[in-house]
């Protein structure tokens, strides 16, 4: 992201969700984004993932500027190269957990058999192997969240965007999620993870703090959450 700003409304009602944000995420690295509610974290993710246009600035993925892409090209990019984990999960109710995870791979041309094998492996790594045949309404909130995460990391993604990926999970399952995201990064995926959890952020290579739509601090975390908490307090 280069000098990205996003405003909503006009004149007296104008709201600056993001202001002149610069953010670079290298392949194989994870960046955690922290900040209070309303600081612009979710807006940053939607713009980074080509789901929303910035008011000013540009977004590049793999060196290609999104502003120069056609609508169809952006759609292909989202389907093939970007994995999303948002707080509402967006699972298809008529598909099982395994089918939800495998669907993006099938849409990208992978055979149904290979897509299912990859999907089952991702679910198994998150402790959901025995729930693969269940529909979303048969799963708990935490289980649905893990299905959404499995769907986001499966396949040949280049960019993973996650909004509070451990928000509905206990500490054990939260760590399983971070291990899966970390494994994706080791395969060369670039990850941006929005979180309020310092323990989760300690997995990142770099932490960015947002406040009122502006980047206020950047740090490389030391092992463990204490360095993040003290870093935020000492800004």
Q: What are the functions of these language-model segments?
A:
Residues 214-235:
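Conserved beta-strand-loop-alpha-helix hinge in the C-terminal portion
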């Amino acid at each position: 992201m280069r000098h990205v700003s996003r405003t909503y409304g006009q004149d007296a009602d104008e709201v600056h969700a993001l202001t002149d944000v610069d953010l670079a995420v290298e392949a194989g690295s994870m960046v955690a984004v922290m900040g209070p509610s309303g600081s612009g974290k979710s807006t940053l993710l939607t713009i980074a993932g080509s789901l929303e246009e910035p008011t000013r600035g540009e977004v590049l993925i793999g060196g290609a500027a999104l502003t120069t892409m056609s609508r169809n090209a952006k759609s292909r990019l989202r389907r093939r190269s970007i994995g999303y984990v948002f707080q509402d999960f967006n699972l298809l109710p008529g598909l099982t957990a395994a089918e939800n995870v495998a669907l993006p791979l099938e849409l990208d041309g992978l055979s149904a058999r290979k897509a299912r094998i990859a999907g089952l492996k991702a679910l198994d790594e998150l402790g959901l192997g025995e729930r693969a045949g269940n529909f979303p309404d048969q799963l708990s909130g935490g289980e649905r969240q893990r299905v959404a995460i499995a769907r986001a990391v499966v396949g040949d993604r280049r960019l993973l965007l996650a909004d509070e990926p451990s928000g509905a999970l206990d500490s054990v399952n939260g760590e399983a999620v971070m291990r899966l995201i970390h494994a994706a990064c080791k395969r060369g995926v670039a990850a941006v993870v929005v979180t309020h959890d310092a323990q989760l952020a300690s997995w990142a290579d770099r932490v960015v703090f947002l406040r009122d739509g502006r980047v206020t601090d950047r740090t490389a975390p030391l092992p463990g959450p204490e360095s993040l908490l003290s870093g935020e307090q000492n800004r």
